[in-house]
Structures are given as C-alpha cells and as structure tokens.
Amino acid sequence: MKTMGITGGNGFIASLVKEAMQSTMEIIPLTRKELDLGETAAVRSWFNTHDYDYVFHTGAMAQTADCENHPELTHRINVDGTKEIAKACKEKNARLIFISTEQCFNGKTEEGPFTEDTPLCSVTAYGNHKAECEAFITSVLEDYIILRFSWMLGMSRPGIKASPNIIRNVMNAMFYQTPAKFTVNEIRGMTYAQKLADVFDKIIELPSGIYHVSDTNTHNTYESANIVAQKLGFTQEQIDACILPNHERYADRFRDYRLDTQKLKAHGIDFGTFEENVDACLKDFGWLK
C-alpha cells in the first residue's frame, strides 16, 4: 500500500481527502501539532527522515489579512516550508500535490476564465506566495501536480470543519435574520469540496502539471448568494431583506477569478456548474430532496 503525507492534516480539504483515500492508501496527517510549517529545519528533518510516495501539501496561512499584516511569518510558512517539502520530494522521488489558488489572478484586468498557461498577476501577499511556490516547484520537480482551487464550498459535519464559504454565509444571514452584504463586483468559481475528494484518486495519477479545480459560474457573488437562498426555500422578499448587494467592495476594479477547466475535463474530470455544486452539497446534508 502506498503512503501519502498530508500537511494541514486537520483542515477542511485534507480531512475530506483523508476520508476518501484511507481505504486504499496509508495516510499520514500532519497537523500543526506534529509539524510547524514555519520551522523550516523541522520541516526539512521530517520530510527527509520519513518514507512516502505522495505529499498532499494543503497547509498554509491563507487569510489575506494575516499575509498582509505578518509578511515574514506567512512567507516562511507558505513559501519557505513549501520549498523544503519540494526539495525533499525530489530526493525521495515522491510526487508532490500542491494546492494553489485562483488568487494568483486577482490582479488581472481582463476577463476570465483563465487557463493554466495564463501569466499570473496577483495584488495580494497570499496570491504572490502561491505564485512563488508554483515557480519553485515547476523549476525543481519533474513529478508534481499543482491544483489551483476556486473558492471551495461545503458544510461541517462530525470530525470535519468546513472553511468559510458562500453556503455557510448565506445560511447565517437567512436563518439568523442577520443581513449580510455580498459583492456585485466579483465573479468566481465556487466548487463543492466533496466533489474534489471523490475524484482525488484520479487527480493524483494525472500527468505532471498544473490543473484548475473549479465549477463553471456565470453569476457574480451577490447573484450566487441569491441562488443559494432560493434553493434553501426562502421567498424573494425574505432574501431581499437579508442578502444585500455590496456595490462598494472592489468598486475600483471588477474582479474576475474564474478558472478555465478544459484541461481537467480532457482527463474526464468535470466539476459541473455552480448550481449543480450547490444542489449536491445541499442534498448531501439533507437540505434538498
């Protein structure tokens, strides 16, 4: 049985993938307790002294504010730690599966969707961290998978805590009758994370390269929030009272983060439309029949 180490081992994506893969692969989940990615010497030591066939590197400090306010710490975790893992994978002849992000394109002024070959342009520290990691991985390794994620959605359940996402945000607004604003100046993919976990066995065997993981979405974030609320059964009057358009955020420049996914589709992996992803999530958790 092959072995896969997973950094960020108790995170949302890591937990789903561990659950999906643990019957066919030995999984070594590495949480911050076992390995602090900010301690480069410890990262180097662990990956040089353990055996593994794959590393799924999900661990990172992904909050934009943290990256902007603590540039040295977050660079050490997000970039320096990744470089140590990549170098170890080369020595061990192990395949690195690295999570990157749509935020590598957040400085683009043209419309998406963007392909894997589109030049990167980020205006945030987090996006630049991921771009720097991508450049290092592609220059050092021959055997790697870089997955640029859209915004991943889902819901929490015992043992797995979902990351903040549009479904949770809409539910909080509607069920607690707490009005929330959603920007009209942004369009992005929003993909049900379980769909990724369900095909992860295929993803880790893809040819080496960069791949975009995203649904297809033609709605801005405010429109997307409306769709979620409608699927939850609320009337438009109820929705209009709690799902509010935010015209101020990104008023300087419309953000288009959409990712072109034709490359993955050519390998038989298709994450479908935004509506299909929301339906799948709500059905899995009993909110839709």
Question: Which positions does each model-derived feature cover?
Answer:
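Alpha-helical substrate-binding/gating segment
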Residues: 167-180, 186-215
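N-terminal Rossmann NAD(P)H-binding glycine-rich loop of SDR-like oxidoreductase domains
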Residues: 2-21
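Adenosine-cofactor binding site in Rossmann-like domains, unifying the SAM/SAH pocket
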Residues: 26-45
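Conserved C-terminal active-site "lid" loop/helix of NAD(P)H-dependent oxidoreductases
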Residues: 220-226, 243-281, 285-289
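Mid/C-terminal beta-alpha module of Rossmann-like enzyme folds, strongest
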Residues: 199, 203-250, 289
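NAD(P)H-binding glycine-rich loop region in Rossmannoid oxidoreductase-like domains
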Residues: 40-77, 88-90
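Catalytic helix-loop patch of NAD(P)-dependent Rossmann-fold dehydrogenases
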Residues: 76, 81-84, 104-147, 152-153, ...
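NAD(P)-dependent short-chain dehydrogenase/reductase
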Residues: 138-188
